[in-house]
Each structure stands twice: as structure tokens, then as C-alpha cells.
Amino acid sequence: MQRQVVIEEFKQRNLNQPYGDASHLLRALAYKVHPYQWPTIGKEISHIANATLEEVKAFFFKYYAPDNAILAVTGHITFEETVTLAEKWFGPIPRRNVAPRSLPAEPRQTEERRLTVERNVPVDALFMAFHICERRHPDYYAFDMLSDLLSSGRSCRLVQHLVQEKQVFNSIDAYISGSIDEGLFHITGKPAPG
């Protein structure tokens, strides 16, 4: 196990840059029951440093198997070539019964939750999130389109209105989390000075 590599990745993404832990803080605020409240890599370095090889292996064999894998292939290759190569490289891996996915549903949020963090960062930042439907729900694609309409490109609604016209933000973005279960619609921005 390359523990130090994972620790360095955690530091690089979460500790060594301004706002690096913003998504961790926001998820912990947005989710009270569902495991989405915890980052995959862990909440702190001790989670990585204290993980035993036995725990990592047990987790791997519980959740990682050909039975629940997805293979994405791109490039100049035919379907037949893809099948041949997939069978060659992945066919020998034995099937295993993986644990059924059983996660608690996040209760409906009925109140606003806020967290103010004061740090020495280059500029203030705003991170907001709103609960949205699961990825398999038909409305998921409407949220995806809405996030693009609001923040993709210089002519998008949020940039035109809040950055160019009102000049209350220097930058603003909207995006959705691609979660299997109910996800989040994010709005992030850097307010203009003053």
C-alpha cells in the first residue's frame, strides 16, 4: 500500500491550496445521514495513516469485482476488438458476490444550514449547495442543463447578470454532483471587493 502517496494527494487537494477543503465542509453540512457527507479519501490524514492493509483489502474485496465494474473505452477501436481485448485482460478475473448496495436515504432538508469559515485566503469565496434528485431520475438531466444555462460560457445567465452587469462577483459557477443517490446542485463564486 502506498500510504504516503495517498497522504500527499490528500494534502495537495485539501490542505495545500485555498478552499481545498470547501467541498468536505459543504458535504458535511448538506448530508446528515447519507455517506456522501464523508469524502472518499477520508476526512483527515489520520484516516489514511491509520488504515491497515487488512482493512483496505477487506474493503476492496467487499466492493470491487467484475460484477459491479464499468469499462469505458474510447479511441479508434471496433466493438469486436473491444470485446476481444476485454475478454483477454478482464475475463480471467473471477466473479464474486459483492455486498448489495444499501445506504441510508438522506432525510428531506427543512431548514437552511450555514457555515462561515474565516481564513487567510486570497479572496472571499461563496459555496452553496441545494439537494437534487438521484442520477437515475428523469429530472437529473434538467438540473444538468440548468447548471450549463446558468454558468457555461461568458454569455451565461450568472456571469452576465452577477459578474458583468451588477459586478457583485468576479467569478461564479454552477454545477451538479454526478451522484448515484440524491446529489447536490452547487453554486460557487468569488465576490467582487467592496
Question: What is each residue range found by the language model?
Answer:
Residues 1-2, 8, 19-46, 68-74, ...:
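M16 family metallopeptidases and their MPP-like homologs
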Residues 3, 7, 19, 23, ...:
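Extracytoplasmic/secreted envelope proteins and their assembly/folding machinery
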Residues 9, 28-69, 97, 101-106, ...:
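Histidine-acidic residue clusters that define the catalytic metal-binding segment
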Residues 10, 14, 81, 89-97, ...:
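A generic secondary-structure signal for well-formed alpha-helical elements
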Residues 16, 136-139:
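Solvent-exposed, non-transmembrane alpha-helical starts
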Residues 32, 37, 65-66, 70-134:
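An aromatic/glycine/proline-enriched structural segment found at the starts
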Residues 35, 57-61, 113-117, 171-177:
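Short beta-strand/turn micro-motifs at beta-sheet edges
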Residues 128, 138-150, 158-162:
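Active/ligand-binding-proximal structured segments within catalytic/core domains
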